[in-house]
């Protein structure tokens, strides 16, 4: 499981950073890629990666500001060319209005897609659990921005315990079909009458990963709720230390406020993104150092960077 950042800039593209988009790679888990936001130029960024557009099965939009959605029409159209014979349908989750934006853009431009898009829109009254599969659950909660904006909490369900193969061999279980039965939780009886209780040879279920991905926001209690015990928290840091008033006036956060959220939530790692173009390389280093005084495991991400979860 990996996060790859396609755009880490704030508001508008710069030479160093494109506007907002990232993907959660779940190839080993479910052979899918989930995208979060799709700012202008996202499809160009994808060309610099190994991501296959047809593997992107779900897109989660945090809010309807242009730097988070203007890349959708182009990406959706290009995806139809690249899918070839393996047409894969797509689901888009986001605030009310995202369906109208996408369909209007496609209609006005005369674009026709060979795959189906299922829209899942929500407002302030329909948040909470927005998706559940056999392996993942996704929650959305309202943040505090200048327009309706949400953050997402992706929870992987507990993983099956692992089989202790060495222990099985020690008690005389031959490698082969019997191993498979025990792994599937089935008790077996050996030829000599020895009964093997499967539960004795399988470790306890392992907790799944938790990933919190927030849209644009001031510091708010919802951010903490979404990030509780998260393995990774992705939080915006449009402003730096000392710019709290500016951040509040414009509906954003500072690096220090993001660090406070991570600390209060008990998150394991903090990844700062949505970085203003006014921050140069030396400023980014200082931004990380300042935030680490509040929350140690912090990193400022850059475009195309991939982070293992």
Curated annotation (Swiss-Prot):
The active site is at residue 67. Zn(2+) 2 binds at residues 67-68, 216, 274. Its cofactor is Zn(2+). Zn(2+) 1 binds at residues 63, 65, 145, 216. Keywords: Endonuclease, Hydrolase, Metal-binding, Nuclease, tRNA processing, Zinc. It holds the Pfam family Lactamase_B. Binds 2 Zn(2+) ions. Belongs to the RNase Z family. The keyword tRNA processing applies. It comes from the Bacteria. Homodimer. It comes from Streptococcus sanguinis (strain SK36). InterPro entries: Metallo-B-lactamas, RibonucZ/Hydroxyglut_hydro, RNase_Z/BN. The gene is rnz. One of its GO terms (molecular function) is zinc ion binding. Zinc phosphodiesterase, which displays some tRNA 3'-processing endonuclease activity. Probably involved in tRNA maturation, by removing a 3'-trailer from precursor tRNA. Gene3D superfamilies: Ribonuclease Z/Hydroxyacylglutathione hydrolase-like (3.60.15.10). It is an enzyme of class 3 (hydrolase). This is Ribonuclease Z. Its EC number is 3.1.26.11. It catalyses: Endonucleolytic cleavage of RNA, removing extra 3' nucleotides from tRNA precursor, generating 3' termini of tRNAs. A 3'-hydroxy group is left at the tRNA terminus and a 5'-phosphoryl group is left at the trailer molecule.
């Amino acid at each position: 499981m990996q996060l790859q950042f396609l755009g880490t800039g704030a508001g508008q593209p710069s030479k160093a950073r494109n506007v907002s988009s990232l993907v959660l790679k779940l190839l080993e888990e479910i052979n899918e890629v989930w995208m979060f936001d799709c700012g202008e130029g996202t499809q160009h960024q994808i060309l610099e990666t190994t991501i296959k557009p047809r593997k992107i099965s779900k897109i989660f939009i945090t809010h309807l500001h242009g730097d988070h959605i203007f890349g959708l029409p182009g990406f959706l159209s290009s995806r139809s060319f690249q899918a070839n014979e393996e047409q894969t349908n797509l689901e888009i989750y986001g605030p009310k209005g995202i369906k109208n934006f996408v369909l209007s853009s496609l209609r006005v431009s005369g674009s026709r897609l060979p795959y189906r898009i299922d829209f899942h829109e929500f407002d302030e009254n329909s948040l909470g659990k927005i998706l559940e599969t056999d392996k993942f659950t996704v929650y959305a909660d309202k943040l505090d921005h200048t327009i309706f904006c949400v953050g997402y909490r992706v929870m992987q369900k507990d993983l099956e315990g692992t089989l202790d193969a060495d222990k099985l061999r020690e008690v005389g279980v031959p490698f082969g079909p019997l191993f498979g039965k025990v792994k599937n939780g089935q008790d077996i009886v050996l030829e000599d009458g020895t009964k093997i209780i499967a539960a004795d040879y399988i470790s306890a279920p392992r907790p799944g990963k938790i990933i919190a991905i927030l849209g644009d926001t001031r510091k708010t209690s919802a951010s903490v709720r979404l990030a509780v015990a998260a393995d990774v928290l992705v939080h915006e840091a449009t402003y730096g230390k000392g710019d709290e008033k500016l951040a509040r006036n414009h509906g954003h956060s500072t690096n220090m406020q993001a660090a406070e959220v991570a600390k209060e939530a008990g998150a394991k790692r903090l990844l700062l993104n949505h970085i203003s173009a006014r921050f140069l390389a030396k400023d980014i280093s200082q931004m990380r150092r300042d935030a680490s005084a509040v929350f140690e495991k912090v990193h400022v991400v850059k475009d195309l960077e991939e982070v293992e979860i």
